[in-house]
């Protein structure tokens, strides 16, 4: 790679700061790489697909108030695909297109990945942030995919071994197929 790009050894952590996903860092980095190969950065981004690795709140039967059971994820039922996220209605949200949801669904099913869909809870019950919205703003197809977590953000969180393994399989098949 060009030496100017080789010097860039930063990692995007959440959304804050000059290397976060809410900065211009990723866009500039992709534009630099694309230019070296003779492409436009916006064309590379517009033809990209992304899985945003993010957990989802699993339905908690001992504290079901913030959940809508029919739209929740559950532990031991596979990796969770979250079509939309956000809080306060549509604030801080990302909403994957139906076509991209279908692409991800077909990819997982055709490769034996156990998956489920789920929301993060009732509207305005708290939570729901995602970094996927920053990727989506670059015109990249993106959807949140991750492990359902029981008692998220509590002192004792629980995840399932099978869900974790299915998340591994989902990301592996995404990068290899």
What are these regions (language model features)?
Residues 7, 37-47, 108-122:
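Flexible, glycine/charged-enriched surface loops at secondary-structure junctions
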Residues 15-20, 61-65, 156-158:
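Short acidic, glycine/serine/threonine-rich loops at helix termini
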Residues 23-82:
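A glycine- and small/hydrophobic-rich beta-loop-beta segment
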Residues 1-13:
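Single conserved hydrophobic/aromatic residue that forms the stacking wall/gate
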Residues 62-63, 67-154:
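Active-site-adjacent substrate-binding region
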Residues 16-21, 34, 67, 93, ...:
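Non-transmembrane, aqueous-exposed alpha-helical and coiled segments at domain scale
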Residues 147-177:
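His/Asp/Glu-rich mid-to-C-terminal helical/loop segments that flank catalytic regions of hydrolases
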Residues 10, 46-56, 121-130:
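A glycine-rich phosphate-binding loop feature that marks nucleotide/adenosyl-phosphate handling sites
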């Amino acid at each position: 790679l060009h030496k100017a790009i080789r010097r860039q050894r930063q990692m995007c952590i959440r959304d804050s700061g000059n290397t976060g996903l809410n900065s211009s860092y990723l866009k500039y980095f992709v534009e630099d790489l694309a230019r070296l190969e003779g492409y436009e950065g916006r064309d590379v981004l517009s033809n990209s697909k992304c899985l945003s690795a993010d957990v989802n709140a699993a339905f908690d039967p001992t504290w079901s108030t913030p959940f809508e059971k029919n739209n929740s994820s559950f532990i031991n039922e596979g990796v969770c695909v979250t079509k939309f996220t956000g809080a306060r209605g549509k604030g801080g949200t990302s909403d994957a297109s139906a076509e991209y949801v279908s692409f991800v669904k077909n990819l997982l099913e055709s490769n034996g990945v156990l998956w489920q869909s789920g929301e993060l809870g009732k509207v305005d019950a708290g939570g729901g942030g995602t970094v996927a919205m920053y990727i989506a703003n670059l015109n990249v197809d993106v959807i949140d995919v991750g492990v359902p977590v029981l008692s998220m953000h509590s002192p004792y969180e629980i995840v399932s071994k099978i869900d974790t393994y299915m998340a591994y399989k989902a990301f592996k098949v995404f990068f290899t197929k």
